[in-house]
Amino acid sequence: MVAGINLMQETKSIRDVEIEGKRVLIRVDFNVPMDSDFNISDDTRIREAIPTINHCIDNGAKSIVLVSHLGRPRGKSSEFSLKHILKRLERLLNRSVIFVESLEGVSSVMATLPQKSVILLENIRFLEGEEKNDEKLSKNLASLCDIYINDAFGASHRKHASTYGVAKFAPVKVAGLLLKKEIDSFAKALASPLKPVLLIVGGSKVSSKITLLSNILDVVDKIVIGGAMSNTFLKSLGYDMQRSLVEDPLVPEAAKILGLAKQKGVKIYLPVDVVCTDDIKNPKEIKITPAQDVPENFLAADIGPASVKLFGEVIRDCETIIWNGPMGVYEVQNFSRGTFQLAHVVADTYAYSVIGGGDTADAIDRAGEKDNMSFTSTGGGASLELLEGKILPAFEVLERK
């Protein structure tokens, strides 16, 4: 794991290349959440791309083409058009941005624009070849630039034309400032951390975190497991979890991880009590019970107050904290307390805290602690793969120092 992170840290960034007079193509991640009226509910990913775009403007780039996806469209769809983010992007950049609907139109537009112009290409996933890493599309994208910059950490685990294929044909290919910040922040937590190191892991499925748990035992000193995935671990201890979400085929795997952690001297903490209910959406009854005493026909939906107290003590004892996955169904107010209270505890420590993207970042934001964490990643799946010890495909094709 550490070797892979160190290798990714050696990637050249835009600070290592001459940009003046060059045509630049930046793969950004503008995949932001929007409501039914296309109002952006969280513009973090757009904000995080601004420093790289401004660096190119300030250093005299001839033209700047921005490429991103939005959602998972099946062909062209107005619902997933990047037109919806254009005004927010212009406001954050404090300059006008030219929107181009087709790849073919970019070259002709570029020929007529003044120096330092910024162009936003329509959703790259509208093009069939994007997710197939199509060679022709990759070459077409590369033809638009002298320098290819990947700044889309949230998509850096994908082998797509705009994140992977294009780099093979671009004359120069480097990391943007966000991509560099992401890898350096994870390196601080994983490759050269202050100890003790704690992993807080949650979410609904053990299956999505098995590789992470197996590989990170050599890096961390303690692990707190919450969320529905803790049910599978509790069942491996012989607890009857009633209607709680349990991945029965993975109960032996959970027991194996507990045994392996013990061998390596890594202390694992599981919930000692849970908030359980008869129904998550329309609960008639909500109870706090010991983890081993979930009532018949009930299911665990959050960690209980004794677990919050226990986990809080563990958190306060650590110098580095990595958090991936919520402690309960935090989107529902009745079952959000465990996640939110742990967020407050982490925020109150002096520890270096790294928050995995996706649900974890959303939960921390809802808890009002987003600005009190050392670093919050913009990538959900990408941060998980990084924690699993993988070298992300986007880094494989960028130049090294």
UniProtKB/Swiss-Prot annotation:
<feature type="binding site">
    <location>
        <begin position="29"/>
        <end position="31"/>
    </location>
    <ligand>
        <name>substrate</name>
    </ligand>
</feature>
<feature type="binding site">
    <location>
        <position position="45"/>
    </location>
    <ligand>
        <name>substrate</name>
    </ligand>
</feature>
<dbReference type="InterPro" id="IPR015824">
    <property type="entry name" value="Phosphoglycerate_kinase_N"/>
</dbReference>
<feature type="binding site">
    <location>
        <begin position="69"/>
        <end position="72"/>
    </location>
    <ligand>
        <name>substrate</name>
    </ligand>
</feature>
<dbReference type="GO" id="GO:0006096">
    <property type="term" value="P:glycolytic process"/>
</dbReference>
<dbReference type="GO" id="GO:0005524">
    <property type="term" value="F:ATP binding"/>
</dbReference>
<feature type="binding site">
    <location>
        <position position="125"/>
    </location>
    <ligand>
        <name>substrate</name>
    </ligand>
</feature>
<dbReference type="Pfam" id="PF00162">
    <property type="entry name" value="PGK"/>
</dbReference>
<dbReference type="InterPro" id="IPR015911">
    <property type="entry name" value="Phosphoglycerate_kinase_CS"/>
</dbReference>
<dbReference type="GO" id="GO:0043531">
    <property type="term" value="F:ADP binding"/>
</dbReference>
<feature type="binding site">
    <location>
        <position position="331"/>
    </location>
    <ligand>
        <name>ATP</name>
    </ligand>
</feature>
<comment type="similarity">
    <text>Belongs to the phosphoglycerate kinase family.</text>
</comment>
<keyword id="KW-0418">Kinase</keyword>
<keyword id="KW-0324">Glycolysis</keyword>
<dbReference type="InterPro" id="IPR036043">
    <property type="entry name" value="Phosphoglycerate_kinase_sf"/>
</dbReference>
<keyword id="KW-0808">Transferase</keyword>
<feature type="binding site">
    <location>
        <position position="209"/>
    </location>
    <ligand>
        <name>ATP</name>
    </ligand>
</feature>
<feature type="binding site">
    <location>
        <position position="158"/>
    </location>
    <ligand>
        <name>substrate</name>
    </ligand>
</feature>
<feature type="binding site">
    <location>
        <begin position="357"/>
        <end position="360"/>
    </location>
    <ligand>
        <name>ATP</name>
    </ligand>
</feature>
<keyword id="KW-0963">Cytoplasm</keyword>
<dbReference type="GO" id="GO:0006094">
    <property type="term" value="P:gluconeogenesis"/>
</dbReference>
<keyword id="KW-0547">Nucleotide-binding</keyword>
<dbReference type="InterPro" id="IPR001576">
    <property type="entry name" value="Phosphoglycerate_kinase"/>
</dbReference>
<dbReference type="GO" id="GO:0005829">
    <property type="term" value="C:cytosol"/>
</dbReference>
<protein>
    <recommendedName>
        <fullName>Phosphoglycerate kinase</fullName>
        <ecNumber>2.7.2.3</ecNumber>
    </recommendedName>
</protein>
<comment type="pathway">
    <text>Carbohydrate degradation; glycolysis; pyruvate from D-glyceraldehyde 3-phosphate: step 2/5.</text>
</comment>
<comment type="subunit">
    <text>Monomer.</text>
</comment>
<keyword id="KW-0067">ATP-binding</keyword>
<dbReference type="GO" id="GO:0004618">
    <property type="term" value="F:phosphoglycerate kinase activity"/>
</dbReference>
